[in-house]
Amino acid sequence: MRVVGADISKMSVVDMKTGVCSSELKPSVDEPTHRVLYQAFPEILSVVHTHSKYATSFAQANLEIKNYGTTHSDFTKYSIPCTEVISKELLTESYEKNTGKLIIKTLKELGISPFEIPGILVANHGVFSWGKDLKTAVKNAESIEYIANLAFNTLLIKPKISIIPKHIS
């Protein structure tokens, strides 16, 4: 996954308090998810959403990405969590906004800050990552995809593997 030719002039500008778009470009349909995250975690200054192959495969399986090795530990000592499946009521009420609330709920239930785990899998959906700027948020999305690829291959080789021992991570 790479961001090629990112052009800030091709990005929509949205007021995070009101949700009003002040540019000519239409914001992403996931904008309400981004806005909820920015409001809940003011230290987050950029959010990236992907449907990368391996991480999204874990999301579609409703599985966290467990920490099997030091490469994962270099990114975070925690598993990359997966939210619970969104309810039918929340889906029909305001899917994108409630997706953001589900991300917040998951992090709070785990007792982990968004910078201890700078990304999450949304069940049956995809990946959201964040950071102090766009470059960091993209790098976090790339790291989650790489870790998911390693975890996938590790599970193929040894399906009943245990997570990395704490003294190594």
For the regions a language model picked out, list residue spans one by one.
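Glycine-rich flexible loops
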Residues: 1-169
